[in-house]
Swiss-Prot record:
Domain SCAN box: 46-128
Positions bearing the Glycyl lysine isopeptide (Lys-Gly) (interchain with G-Cter in SUMO2) cross-link: 20, 25, 196
SUPFAM superfamilies: beta-beta-alpha zinc fingers (SSF57667), Retrovirus capsid dimerization domain-like (SSF47353)
Species: Pongo pygmaeus (Bornean orangutan)
Name of this chain's protein: Zinc finger and SCAN domain-containing protein 12
Main location group: nucleus
Location(s), subcellular: Nucleus
Pfam families: SCAN (PF02023), zf-C2H2 (PF00096)
Gene Ontology molecular function terms on file: DNA-binding transcription factor activity, RNA polymerase II-specific; RNA polymerase II cis-regulatory region sequence-specific DNA binding; zinc ion binding
Length: 604
């Protein structure tokens, strides 16, 4: 790119405004007219129109005239109908009202109508809500932002959209995964090379970019090869292979055959002899032009035989077919989990390495996946449009609402492949799987038990007696936050876990699960000594004390020991003593003390 955009407006009061765009040296009037029709140049004029300052002019008349000319260059009433101009204005306002974290990303897709924006956002919402190959509490392993014509593997490249760089620099999209290029190149051969070249050309600056970007990307932009930032600043042979293959003199790219070398050298100098008749964009290879023209014609020749969905490029179709085949060729060396996409594996590996590339601009919290950041941002905006009809709780995502509804229905769709245990939430499954995935490597020095890192911290509170979670109503303290949440339902009266069979509600999910076994007759906990079976693990533990003779609950007054910590029913006390009210009250008070402490307090 010769230089950055510069606009100069010189006007006398009696002369028409003259706007000069200095980007390239156009040799003919036809070149300039063709360039004027480019969508990106219209975007430049729109930016100057919106950001025009009154102080830049000598007076109000000049300011008005310059605004008129900039608006004319943007909307172009000589070529656009009223409906098209109206659509441009609606599109601009639509992009303006989008959440800030979405604006820059949507504008990178270069939508030309409001309908295109809607399609992009609906596709994004569907991908965010899909369970996919999930490995974290927030999202799954998904390529949410890889649409058909979005570049793959441009790691380290800054966004070249004028809007994202100038108007909203702090919402630039984080880099995508560069490894995808290598994988897809192997799978699809030269087809991906063609697509990669076009993507590189489409990512050339069209707006008010800085010379810094041009210097950093001068090599990679010429030939479409991708380099990491450190590779660009170091030796140009960083991408060449160790086995002395022919390399390009321009950038050190390895080439396997002489034909590849000839073709590659024609691309590197920037020769672009194939021009698009619709928008004027030029390409170095005819195949790139053909694929680009499908944007204008709407042609999608590559059709999936399974679902009928069509695509503009063969590479995108190949990537799509993995959904139907269920193939998962990319395997994690740490835990053995397999994925259908390289990017999914790459994101998953961040769980092991601890890398978190995506940061929240509001609170600084970091995430390993882009979807996790998007969901987190909604917390700050308090955007919770999805409401549960059972308990009226609201959620920021439809997928979270669906998971929450499992609390009421008892559905547990997330099952562990190792032990078969099922969970309502995917995050609970992920935490559980740490047990199987060699995460249980932190040992308690007090008792020798092993836990995950977070599990060890909670466990050690048993030995230290620390109870950091305190109830504000009764000041009772707990070791875990979940225990505090369950306790607080005593004060609020909330019983979110309801039985579908009899309608009875409970404060804890585990109690509901145990209750439902009354209806199903299931008794999964069996005593090894006598064969008796029980609905709950607590009942089994209490029963086993009959065989072991264990009595862990001891009275502080007399030393008498008990197997259970049982309290007498309030209703039972009042019914038995209805003729002697004072006796009933005394017994009711004594029932507030556990059985193993009330044996010596007969004076109540």
């Amino acid at each position: 790119m010769a230089s950055t955009w510069a606009i100069q407006a010189h006007m006398d009061q009696d002369e028409p405004l003259e706007v000069k765009i200095e980007e390239e040296k156009y040799t003919t009037r036809q070149d300039w007219d063709l360039r004027k029709n480019n969508t990106h140049s219209r975007e430049v004029f729109r930016q100057y129109f919106r950001q025009f300052c009154y102080q830049e002019t000598s007076g109000p008349r000049e300011a008005l005239s310059r605004l008129r000319e900039l608006c004319h260059q943007w909307l172009r009433p000589e070529t656009h109908t009223k409906e098209q101009i109206l659509e441009l204005l609606v599109l601009e306002q639509f992009l303006t009202i989008l959440p800030e974290e979405l604006q820059a990303w949507v504008q990178e897709q270069h939508p030309e109508s409001g309908e295109e924006v809607v399609t992009v956002l609906e596709d994004l919402e569907r991908e965010l809500d899909e369970p996919g190959e999930q490995v974290s509490a927030h999202t799954g392993e998904q390529e949410m932002f890889l649409q058909e014509m979005v570049p793959l593997g441009k790691e380290g490249e800054p966004s070249m959209s004028l809007q994202s760089m100038k108007a909203q620099p702090k919402y630039e999209s984080p880099e995508l995964e560069s490894q995808q290029e290598q994988v897809l190149d192997v799978e699809t051969g030269n087809e991906y090379g063609n697509l990669k070249q076009e993507v590189s050309e489409e990512m050339e600056p069209h707006g008010n970019t800085s010379s810094k970007f041009e210097n950093d990307m001068s090599k990679s932009a010429r030939c479409g090869e991708t380099h990491k930032p450190e590779e660009i600043t170091e030796e140009p042979s960083a991408c060449s292979r160790e086995d002395k293959q022919p390399t390009c003199d321009e950038n050190g790219v390895s080439l396997t055959e002489n034909s590849d070398h000839t073709e590659h050298q024609r691309i590197c100098p920037g020769e672009k002899s194939y021009g698009c008749d619709d928008c004027g964009k030029a390409f170095s290879q005819h195949s790139h032009l053909i694929e680009h023209q499908r944007i204008h014609t709407g042609d999608r020749p590559y059709k999936c035989e399974e679902c009928g969905k069509a695509f503009r490029g063969r590479t995108v179709l190949i990537r799509h077919k993995i959904i139907h085949t269920g193939e998962k060729p990319y395997k994690c060396n740490e835990c053995g989990k397999a994925f259908g996409r390289w990017s999914a594996l790459n994101q998953h590996q961040r769980l092991h390495t601890g890398e978190k590339h995506y940061h929240c601009n509001d609170c600084g919290k970091a995430f390993s996946q882009k979807a996790g950041l998007f969901h987190h941002i909604k917390i700050h905006k308090r955007d919770k449009p999805y409401q549960c009809t059972q308990c009226n709780k609201s959620f920021s995502r439809r997928s979270i609402l669906t998971q929450h509804q499992g609390v009421h229905t008892g559905a547990k769709p997330y099952e562990c492949n190792e032990c078969g245990k099922a969970f309502v939430y995917n995050s609970s499954l992920v935490s559980h799987q740490e047990i199987h995935h060699k995460e249980k490597c932190y040992q308690c020095k007090e008792c020798g038990k092993s836990f995950s890192q977070s599990g060890l911290i909670q466990h050690q509170r048993i030995h230290t007696g620390e109870k950091p979670y305190k109830c504000e109503v009764c000041e009772k303290a707990f070791i875990q936050r979940t225990s505090l949440t369950e306790h607080q339902r005593i004060h609020t009266g909330e019983r979110p876990y309801k039985c579908d069979k009899c309608g009875k509600a409970f404060t804890q999910r585990s109690v509901l699960t145990e209750h439902q076994r009354i209806h199903t007759g299931e008794r999964p906990y069996k005593c090894d000594e006598c064969g008796n079976a029980f609905r709950g693990i607590t009942s089994l533990i209490q029963h086993q004390r009959i065989h072991t003779g264990e009595k862990p609950y001891q009275c502080d007054e007399c030393g008498k020991a008990f197997r259970q910590r049982r309290k007498t029913s309030y209703k039972e006390i009042l019914l038995k003593n209805h003729s002697e009210p004072q006796a009933g009250v005394n017994l009711l008070l004594s029932s507030l003390i556990p059985e193993w402490q009330s044996c010596c307090r007969k004076d109540l």
